[in-house]
Amino acid sequence: MDKLDIVLYPDEGLREVCKPVPEMTDELDKLIDEMFYTMYDAPGIGLAAPQVAVQQRLIVVDISETKDEPIALLNPEIIKTAGKITWEEGCLSIPGIYAKVDRPSDILVRGMDRDGKTIEFEANELLAVCIQHEIDHLNGKLFIDHLSGLKRTRAIQKFKKEMAEQANS
């Protein structure tokens, strides 16, 4: 199985709105496996297709401690939201940067599973946060976009400094 390269901020592909997936294919099934492999290896709890340079509406998530509850969603959409939660988020495309983000705590999600079937389910707390974070990627939005201007600027400066330090070491 191939580990995919994770696209890093400020790559322009992270700002593109992704195209819907017309149907499930063998290629997409392989991509889903590779995305899970890449996400687990990173390690992370969610990964969106644009983070691996694929501009399609596809996300994978697994918030379980044992990494045995994988969820792959094609063309995911949030149907309903309720509540509010603040969670410290990070992103595999902006490594080392974490910030508290306010989001709905409960969501109703609809999408296509890897068998090509339409599914709908409720997600709460961390799973809801993770799915919303990944769907944001499909719409060209990053978690830092939810921050105030000052916090966003500080996060970006910190990230750029860390990347420069890594490049020089």
Swiss-Prot record:
Entry's Gene Ontology BP terms: co-translational protein modification; translation
GO molecular function list: metal ion binding; peptide deformylase activity
UniProt keyword annotations, A-Z: Hydrolase, Iron, Metal-binding, Protein biosynthesis
Coiled-coil residue windows: none
Enzymatic class: hydrolase
Reactions it catalyzes: N-terminal N-formyl-L-methionyl-[peptide] + H2O = N-terminal L-methionyl-[peptide] + formate
Superkingdom to which the source organism belongs: Bacteria
Cofactor stoichiometry and binding remark: Binds 1 Fe(2+) ion.
Cofactor section: Fe(2+)
Binding site for Fe cation: 91, 133, 137
The enzyme's E.C. designation: 3.5.1.88
Active site, per annotation: 134
Biological role stated in the UniProt entry: Removes the formyl group from the N-terminal Met of newly synthesized proteins. Requires at least a dipeptide for an efficient rate of reaction. N-terminal L-methionine is a prerequisite for activity but the enzyme has broad specificity at other positions.
NCBIfam families named among the record's database cross-references: pept_deformyl (TIGR00079), PRK00150.1-3 (NF001159)
Family membership noted in the UniProt record: Belongs to the polypeptide deformylase family.
Name of the protein: Peptide deformylase
Gene that encodes it: def
